[in-house]
């Protein structure tokens, strides 16, 4: 284990543009259950999963009704806004401050990376801490709208003050496309990176799970084109992909990742930070 942690630290220090991808596993130590694990939200409440799959269809047909259900119905995800970041989130902030991590792309909607202080953050599936205009994609804080008053006055759904588009929660529903701005910026980071640190994700939710595969494939294609005289290679011919997860994933089995450090992200990531500090002395 120690050798892999030191190896990860050296790989990070040798990289020029390292990014991190994070999933539900990094937040379980903050008391937030995952979705499909033994104690996951969908595992324990299959009806909640079925309702989640129908949610976006309801929004498209009747956004006012969708908002009423959000404001009056049970919160199937619990109050994620009360959760606090853990050692894993803070470790990524330390790596960013040390200059070895350039961006975090997360599929989590809990807002914990923002709370921890990550500066360059792309929330692939949105955040419970924000609302989003479905037309112009501007984000807002829920406190900017008096949602209860709008419901009492029969004025749901809320409207964007700039373009009058319909406002929904920023979280991406099943069947809803990833917001184009986030998708584009994520692809740009994947294209630029020479190291990808994948933390706490089983890599089975698409299109997020494609990002590591795209990082690997884009380098092969980029340098094949350069060798063929069809363009200049943008960076090194290989990208280092490191997993930190409680168990092997499809990325491990497919050989997409170079190696995996097995364990809790809240324990492993702080050790990587300490190793980075020791190497920099």
Model regions: which residues?
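Conserved catalytic core of sirtuin-type NAD+-dependent deacylases
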Residues: 1-281
